[in-house]
Amino acid sequence: MEKSSYFLFGGTNFNKKKFAPDFAKFKNSTEDDDSNKKVNFFVEEEEDTEQPEAEKVIVSSKKRKRRSSNSVPVEGFDVFKSSKKARAKGKAEEQITKNEIVENPKKELNRQMERDALSRKQYSIHVSGNNIPPPLKSFAELSSRYGCEGYILRNLAELGFKEPTPIQRQAIPILLSGRECFACAPTGSGKTFAFICPMLIKLKRPSTDGIRAVILSPARELAAQTAREGKKLIKGSNFHIRLMTKPLVKTADFSKLWCDVLISTPMRLKRAIKAKKIDLSKVEYLVLDESDKLFEQSLLKQIDCVVKACSNPSIIRSLFSATLPDSVEELARSIMHDAVRVIIGRKNTASETVKQKLVFAGSEEGKLLALRQSFAESLNPPVLIFVQSKERAKELYDELKCENIRAGVIHSDLPPGERENAVDQFRAGEKWVLIATDVIARGMDFKGINCVINYDFPDSASAYIHRIGRSGRAGRSGEAITFYTEQDVPFLRNIANTMMSSGCEVPSWIMSLKKKKWRKHRPRRDSISTKPKADKNDTDE
């Protein structure tokens, strides 16, 4: 066989007899000049210049050496390698995308939590609890986030609310998210709208199925005021807000009475429950306004009766007050589930917009003289004066009547009509001075009270905060003067601490007094009169 044929068939055992016709075709075919060239599939094409015969290596099919890693890759193999790289790269990118999808919500959640924390810090909002909703940025969010009806936003605008107050920013989203809460915010900070607004949004539309919301207030005056404020907010809707009055308890058929929101004092509501005149099983919202007063020992049985009557398993309870003692907080947690705690500013502190001062009067006679002197120097009505009891309210009223001062008086012995008349005259400016007991210190909103005078030393820090809170409401400035006598000195330190926490200056000697364990400070006081004691004794004889 020729050399070229040998190369072609080298390493094979070809049966020439069996494949004779085919072999003849190959042998007789015309061969090109290039056919004599050696074919090598494992090295690059030889250059045109012929190399010596010795340098031409014939690679045996039995012993094929693997190509070194430095050799140029075959095009076909390189394509497969690049496709593997592409697949590996694609998988890596896919994994990164999946990780980003998982991480992005976490990052966004963390950013949102940071924004919420900054907003709360800006408005001195302190919260504790789980999964707390973000505070409101504006009232417009009530529509975008919660589907608030237009009439509520219109009424808020007409009432002069441009931006939510701090308590409204946080309490409204909490209640709208279906959570229970107890909130402590300074007097005059808009707590009433903070619980009525979400109540109306969640109730959505009026219903004839019975009472769906109950608001409890410790005093009739506060209940009446809450009803007035609520009716301002439902203007333009078909909601019905009713105040529980004495005639209503006696004569009303609550099964036929159209009432969405009922506002009452605990005693009146308890009477209606005991008489089986009212069904509270469908109540969706229960609000305890001025809850620290409602949880006092004298009202606990009444509150317990109302709470049991509101038996709806999905009811949402909320507590609002200007002060939140630890004992009240503990009781609140016993009737609430997974509640959020909201504190605006510092807990149990007076409003920072009220200028506070202590005045030593020495004795009961000295207090009356100090009051007359303050009126002579600068009577800047309207002025609210607080005394310890209804007897002392009557005595002070008799004294001021003789001074030709346009004064009114309100206490629990007066019939409801006279009490309402006294409050209305004071609001209208017909009376410059209103003498009151602590019954009116809770939540009553008198626009523009310039001065509060604690004629009798308050019996607790909580009472002090609520009293002076009638002034300096809704960001206005005000003044609070507290008279004290020798028998009040042991309790000065407690009030001084409250004053300091709201930024007021207190004499150093008062802060050096021993801090006394606080109890109700209601000393027996002499009657209010300008007559000297000797003259009083002569008159008695």
From Swiss-Prot:
Enumerate the CDD domains for this protein. Answer: DEADc_DDX52, SF2_C_DEAD
What are the alphabetically sorted keywords of the record? ATP-binding, Helicase, Hydrolase, Nucleotide-binding, RNA-binding
Give positions of region: Disordered: 43-72, 517-541
Motif DEAD box — list its residue ranges.
289-292
Give the transmembrane region(s).
none
InterPro entries, per this entry? DDX52/Rok1_DEADc, DEAD/DEAH_box_helicase_dom, DEAD_box_RNA_helicase, Helicase_ATP-bd, Helicase_C-like, P-loop_NTPase, RNA_helicase_DEAD_Q_motif
Query: PROSITE patterns recorded for this chain?
Result: HELICASE_ATP_BIND_1, HELICASE_CTER, Q_MOTIF
Q: What is its EC number?
A: 3.6.4.13
Outline the extent of the Helicase ATP-binding domain: 172-342
Q: What molecular functions are annotated in GO for this chain?
A: ATP binding; ATP hydrolysis activity; RNA binding; RNA helicase activity
Swiss-Prot/TrEMBL catalytic activity: ATP + H2O = ADP + phosphate + H(+)
Q: Where is the composition biased (Basic and acidic residues)?
A: 525-541
Compositional bias per record (Acidic residues), positions renumbered to this chain: 43-52
Q: Give residue numbers for sequence motif Q motif.
A: 141-169
- Which Gene3D superfamilies does this entry report, sorted A to Z? P-loop containing nucleotide triphosphate hydrolases
Give the family this protein belongs to, as stated in its UniProt record: Belongs to the DEAD box helicase family. DDX52/ROK1 subfamily.
Let me see what the UniProt entry remarks about domains: The Q motif is unique to and characteristic of the DEAD box family of RNA helicases and controls ATP binding and hydrolysis.
Report the protein name in the record. DEAD-box ATP-dependent RNA helicase 57
Instruction: Provide the species name.
Output: Arabidopsis thaliana (Mouse-ear cress)
Q: What phylogenetic lineage does the species belong to?
A: Eukaryota, Viridiplantae, Streptophyta, Embryophyta, Tracheophyta
